[in-house]
């Protein structure tokens, strides 16, 4: 994060300790005048938390000018990256599935601010910004989206299967809800190894009715696994509104015997506070559910215009009233931590960096055709298989 600190010039002359690396994108934006102060201040969340069989955390969230400026930068970078991905897809440089996250940036950024790299994160197929929040490289992201060798999954994963093992980011998963049991498995490993870490296990409201979620939740509660199940409720499972798919859309109560919180997922400070609270709960008591009330601006995927099952007025209303980036912009301006022009300059620098990352990604070669056969089997594993006739077949895989 030392690179992130360089981004912002001190306004008040306060000597600041470096912010931990876990909460920042690897950007090098430098904007004069934006406050880098670490003087603490308290801001109240936009709305109260709703809770299920647990006392909610306080609405007052401790933050600093530096943190707010970093939030603004990181969310703006994510937004610009997703808009760029939209253009690359329409130019046919990105093929196949592509699910964009713009509008939901506060969830990824707020969650990262409450965790360390020892904590694990696993999510579904809308995973670009979760990867970036874990410190993922912009050029590696775009290279992966374009199927290039320099991608974070060597060009073989594409949009839905980003991965960053050194940051404990276990990727996106294309099957709805399939990642939830895997996340509980990560938490099982953390408990088995006696690690002081938790797993944030993300899924959408469209996956909230999947059977494997309840099976995994039961086992997690039974064994008191250190897992935080995060339902990113953007209110539409593909094109189906939540009220058409769920008898009870209060997803934070779905755990029955598992505590839950409903959080304004468009308020990055509320997300940070809730995730910090949930992490401590998971370490001490086992699983907890966080329902993030959020919203995606794009359609479900690139083939979905996003306007056949909801009105354009609805989308515009959310942008105007709840946009996560604009909320932080208003806080920075209201507390005189930055001027309008300084924030615009930061956004211009971000756009340049995204463009530079795309140009670098385009220079990366396509994977060699032989890559089709790598990482499929383990070499020399001495597989033993049994047929119905009980005869043993031994073989060595290529």
From Swiss-Prot:
Mg(2+) binds at residues 205, 234, 236. Thiamine diphosphate binds at residues 125-126, 174, 176, 205-207, 234, 300. GO terms for cellular component: mitochondrial matrix. Signal peptide: none annotated. Keywords: Magnesium, Metal-binding, Mitochondrion, Oxidoreductase, Phosphoprotein, Pyruvate, Thiamine pyrophosphate, Transit peptide. It is an enzyme of class 1 (oxidoreductase). It catalyses: N(6)-[(R)-lipoyl]-L-lysyl-[protein] + pyruvate + H(+) = N(6)-[(R)-S(8)-acetyldihydrolipoyl]-L-lysyl-[protein] + CO2. Its main location: mitochondrion. Tetramer of 2 alpha and 2 beta subunits. GO terms for molecular function: metal ion binding; pyruvate dehydrogenase (acetyl-transferring) activity. The pyruvate dehydrogenase complex catalyzes the overall conversion of pyruvate to acetyl-CoA and CO(2). It contains multiple copies of three enzymatic components: pyruvate dehydrogenase (E1), dihydrolipoamide acetyltransferase (E2) and lipoamide dehydrogenase (E3). Gene3D superfamilies: 3.40.50.970. Residues 1-33 form a transit peptide. InterPro entries: DH_E1, PDH_E1_Alpha_Subunit, Pyrv_DH_E1_asu_subgrp-y, THDP-binding. Pyruvate binds at residues 99, 125-126, 174, 176, 205-207, 234, 236. Its cofactor is thiamine diphosphate; Mg(2+). This is Pyruvate dehydrogenase E1 component subunit alpha-2, mitochondrial. Pfam families: E1_dh. It comes from the Eukaryota. Its EC number is 1.2.4.1. GO terms for biological process: pyruvate decarboxylation to acetyl-CoA. It is found in: Mitochondrion matrix.
